C-alpha cells in the first residue's frame, strides 16, 4: 500500500512538472528515479506525460527502479542508470474478493493491463516477446549491464572521484 501511494505521488509530481515545464523553454527535464514501484496506473500516467512532453525527458535510475517505475524510466528520451543501481520488471499483482464474476472481471482487466505494459516494454526496449514473457514471470533484479543489453537504458553512468 505504501509503495502504491508513493508511486501515485511521484506520478502526480511528474504530471505537474512536465505540464509546468512544457510551458517554459527548458532544454530538457532530468528525472531521477529511485523507486520500488507501486500502482501500475500511476506509472502509466507518468509515462504518458513523459512521452507527450514537448521537452525531452531524460531518465536516471539511481538505486532502483522497480515495477511501475520502470515504465516511466524506459520511455525517457535518453535513459541512464548508475553503475550501482538495479531495475526490476515483473507481472502485475492484484487481489479480488467477491463473486466468481468479480474474479472473471478482474482477470479480464488484468489481462488488458498486462498487455498494455508488455506493449510499452516491447516498443521502448530491445526485449523480444518470448524473452519478455520469461522475464515477467520472475522477480529478478537486473544489473546495469543487463539493463543496457535489454535496452531498458541507453547508458551506464560510472562514478569517478573528481
Per-region residue spans from a language model:
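Terminal-region recognition feature
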Residues: 1-162
Amino acid at each position: 500500500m505504501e509503495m502504491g501511494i508513493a508511486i501515485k505521488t511521484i506520478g502526480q509530481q511528474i504530471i505537474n512538472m512536465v505540464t509546468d515545464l512544457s510551458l517554459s523553454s527548458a532544454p530538457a527535464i532530468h528525472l531521477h528515479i529511485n523507486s520500488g514501484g507501486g500502482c501500475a496506473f500511476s506509472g502509466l500516467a507518468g509515462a504518458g506525460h513523459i512521452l507527450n512532453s514537448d521537452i525531452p525527458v531524460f531518465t536516471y535510475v539511481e538505486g532502483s527502479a522497480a515495477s511501475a517505475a520502470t515504465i516511466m524510466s524506459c520511455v525517457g528520451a535518453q535513459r541512464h542508470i548508475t553503475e550501482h543501481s538495479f531495475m526490476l520488471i515483473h507481472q502485475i499483482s492484484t487481489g479480488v474478493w467477491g463473486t466468481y464474476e468479480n474474479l472473471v472481471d478482474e482477470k479480464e482487466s488484468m489481462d488488458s493491463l498486462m498487455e498494455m505494459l508488455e506493449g510499452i516494454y516491447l516498443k521502448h526496449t530491445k526485449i523480444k516477446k518470448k524473452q519478455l514473457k520469461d522475464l515477467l514471470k520472475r522477480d529478478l533484479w537486473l544489473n546495469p549491464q543487463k539493463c543496457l543489453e535489454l535496452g531498458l537504458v541507453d547508458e551506464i553512468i560510472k562514478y569517478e572521484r573528481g
